[in-house]
Amino acid sequence: MAKDMTLLWGSGSPPCWRVMIVLEEKNLQAYNSKLLSFEKGEHKSAEVMSMNPRGQLPSFKHGSKVLNESYAACMYLESQFKSQGNKLIPDCPAEQAMMYQRMFEGLTLAQKMADVIYYSWKVPEAERHDSAVKRNKENLSTELKLWEEYLQKTSGSFVAGKSFSLADVSVFPGVAYLFRFGLTEERYPQLTAYYNSLKERPSIKASWPPTWLESPQGQDMLKDV
Amino acid sequence: MAKDMTLLWGSGSPPCWRVMIVLEEKNLQAYNSKLLSFEKGEHKSAEVMSMNPRGQLPSFKHGSKVLNESYAACMYLESQFKSQGNKLIPDCPAEQAMMYQRMFEGLTLAQKMADVIYYSWKVPEAERHDSAVKRNKENLSTELKLWEEYLQKTSGSFVAGKSFSLADVSVFPGVAYLFRFGLTEERYPQLTAYYNSLKERPSIKASWPPTWLESPQGQDMLKDV
């Protein structure tokens, strides 16, 4: 089955990482994997554009079925391989509701993170304002405090209850990215505990960004968030 | 079942409308519905904040289960009431893949729409730039042309294939919002045909924004997009 699958991905990208974690969790490791370089602009190559007119990674294919949106690929894989590997959507209605709620709140977290980390990359120099940088950091901090509360209530190991789920698949890569960019452990103890606990999970370890392994030192952009 | 459900919503809001369409499609019309006013700031009321710390609409509850993210509520309702009303996730793997892909691409469409329509509301006056307004409009136009192509390929009635699905639930309210804000029919014939066809669907008619019925005249903000 996995031999029919092709994933084009970039190292460190949270959306790519989500798909890779699900492929690990569902025992679909035999997929065709191709690491591309954002720095070299390979996400705009003809190979990517033919699968993904947006020129983005991940670009994912199962046979002739194209699923480039990371949430779409994750939902599809869980649905098609429900009884293979680990179950990623809980049956219990209360746990399932919490899982969907946190999974989609994860998009807001990702957005507020991107507003800070990609600011200089996304906003042309003539349109940049210190006031916007400050506000984006405050918004990210407010968002992160909400997740601190959520994790306190679930007592820490998983983001939506008692078991690893698509909510963790969606949220963990962003959390790791935040720490990679200098989030301070002292200010976010629950997120730190969550990060430290999940980074040892086999599916996550196996898909850890190779560029992070090569140069373990991250950046300090978020040290004052 | 639906009597255990409460939806706090605002008229015209695409995320609120998504949940209302699913409730109609799944024959759950007996839910407790409370229309709140964004203009009066009722989305920041104590009632909303107690269900939704983000102070946003929709705020949705099924018993004690809270699902405020519209995509989360839609996924949950389809999962819990699979065999009730209309099936909103196709079984066929190819159709399902397309459905998830379009559903999540819908978030990008919503984002690019928001970047244009909410610009003055979101960006403080001292940080506004004509160049950003122009770029946002161009990005929205590029995005809409992609959807024109998608609709051409599916031959128009539904956004992800042969039947109405969660992809339409996710995308249609945004399309209606675009036309409400002045998108021109001449430039987007496929989106226009899609809009005209789906606006007659019973679930959509029954949940049409009451403020739009009261004052049918929209705005012309998008006339040059």
Curated annotation (Swiss-Prot), chains A, B:
GO biological process, one term: glutathione metabolic process
Compartment list: Cytoplasm
Keyword Cytoplasm: yes
Annotated signal peptide: none
GO molecular function, one term: maleylacetoacetate isomerase activity
EC number assigned by the record: 2.5.1.18
Catalytic activity: RX + glutathione = an S-substituted glutathione + a halide anion + H(+)
Pfam family, one: GST_N_2
Keyword Cytoplasm tagged: yes
Gene Ontology CC: mitochondrion
Domain (GST N-terminal) ranges: 3-85
InterPro entries documented for this protein: Glutathione-S-Trfase_C-like, Glutathione-S-Trfase_C_sf, Glutathione_S-Trfase, Glutathione_S-Trfase_N, GST_C, Thioredoxin-like_sf
Expression (tissue specificity): Found in all the tissues examined. Highest values found in liver and in intestinal mucosa.
Keywords: Cytoplasm, Transferase
Residue intervals of the GST C-terminal domain: 92-217
Binding site for glutathione: 18
Subunit organization: Homodimer.
Family: Belongs to the GST superfamily. Theta family.
Described purpose of this protein according to its UniProt entry: Conjugation of reduced glutathione to a wide number of exogenous and endogenous hydrophobic electrophiles.
Stored PANTHER family: MALEYLACETOACETATE ISOMERASE
Name of this chain's protein: Glutathione S-transferase A
Taxonomic source organism: Pleuronectes platessa (European plaice)
